[in-house]
């Protein structure tokens, strides 16, 4: 056996061992073994691809993107690497790069449910919900068990206010995968919206049984408890959520609501303003902040904040501005 053949054999051995570690979720060891495989055979495109997948599991998307680019350089016809790189580009907010990769492989992937899922995600990131829904529809025609397509389509329906269709998608997703956290979370939020607060708490508890440190479920369960009048239990849950993710605008808003309901208006205002400073959309935040300012007899500041809320289609801000600022 020549040196070259021996190196390729060694590379293949490392690759198989790496795949075993990957399946066992030992991603650090898998990464080391993929590097060994690439070191033995620098043109081993599958090893680059799997190394990229490994880096994604380790929450290193920028590194994954570079490795996937190497895979495509080694084998420009390796369309699977383009698809994974498109997904990675989406995570990194590189929408044009994701679009370019998807265009390159469109013909080869015309019957791929995953391709249409990724393209649907791209359209959603671009703010094109109708294109997104169309691609999720196609993904589900090709694979009716595509849980991510169900959840993501449901999320768009939810944002559009089509609660019935959203609920159906989330329930269908859970019928396939009962541990699907986004579906459980969104059904919990819908239950809050419908004032079915015990149902909501049950959904969030199902998430917390799977992962006791899920910041969104802790916060949302806390919000349900605020609505139920269980203020102290609510504050503990929201506080734990903020320990895990201090920049969750919804948790800051909810802590503000807790302080407001507890008669601590100054502390409530501090939390609301922290949420506003993050500059991410949070339902009813501007409306609630303005109401608190008005209670403190600062009508000018209240009207100013409501005016900002109108731009964000905050229903409380719209109603309060109409009532108090004309």
Where are the predicted features?
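N-terminal leader/linker segments that initiate helical-solenoid repeat arrays
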Residues: 1-50, 57-62, 66-69, 73, ...
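Structural marker of alpha-solenoid helical repeat scaffolds
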Residues: 40, 74, 107-109, 142, ...
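Canonical tetratricopeptide repeat
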Residues: 50, 84, 118, 152, ...
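Structural signature of tandem alpha-helical TPR/SEL1-like repeats
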Residues: 24-33, 58-70, 91-104, 126-138, ...
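Terminal, low-structured helical/coil segments at or just beyond the last alpha-helical repeat
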Residues: 3, 9-12, 284-326
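Helix-start (N-cap) detector for alpha-helical repeat units in TPR-like alpha-solenoids
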Residues: 10-12, 45-46, 79-80, 112-114, ...
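Eukaryotic tandem repeat interaction scaffolds
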Residues: 179-271
């Amino acid at each position: 056996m020549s040196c070259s053949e021996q190196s390729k054999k060694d590379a293949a051995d490392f690759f198989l061992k790496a795949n075993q570690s990957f399946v066992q979720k030992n991603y650090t060891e898998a990464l080391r073994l993929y590097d060994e495989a690439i070191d033995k055979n620098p043109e081993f495109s599958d090893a680059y691809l799997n190394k990229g997948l490994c880096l994604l599991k380790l929450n290193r998307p920028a590194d994954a993107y570079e490795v996937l680019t190497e895979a495509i350089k080694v084998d420009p016809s390796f369309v699977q690497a383009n698809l994974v790189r498109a997904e990675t580009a989406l995570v990194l907010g590189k929408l044009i790069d994701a679009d370019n990769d998807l265009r390159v492989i469109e013909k080869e992937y015309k019957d791929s449910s995953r391709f249409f899922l990724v393209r649907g995600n791209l359209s959603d990131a671009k703010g094109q919900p109708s294109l997104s829904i169309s691609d999720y529809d196609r993904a589900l025609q090709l694979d009716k068990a595509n849980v991510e397509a169900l959840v993501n389509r449901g999320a768009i329906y939810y944002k559009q206010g089509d609660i019935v269709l959203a609920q159906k998608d989330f329930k269908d997703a859970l019928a396939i995968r009962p541990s699907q956290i986004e579906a459980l979370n969104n059904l919990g939020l819908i239950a809050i919206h419908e004032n079915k607060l015990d149902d909501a708490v049950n959904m969030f508890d199902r998430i917390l049984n799977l992962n006791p440190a899920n910041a969104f479920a802790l916060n949302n369960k806390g919000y349900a408890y605020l609505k139920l009048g269980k203020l102290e239990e609510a504050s503990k849950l929201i506080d734990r959520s903020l320990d895990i993710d201090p920049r969750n605008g919804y948790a800051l808003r909810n802590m503000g609501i807790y302080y407001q309901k507890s008669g601590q208006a100054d502390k409530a205002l501090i939390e609301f303003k922290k949420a506003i400073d993050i500059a991410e959309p949070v339902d009813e935040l501007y409306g609630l902040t303005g109401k608190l300012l008005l209670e403190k007899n600062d009508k000018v500041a209240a009207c100013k904040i409501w005016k900002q809320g109108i731009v964000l289609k905050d229903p409380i801000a719209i109603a309060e501005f109409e009532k108090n600022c004309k």
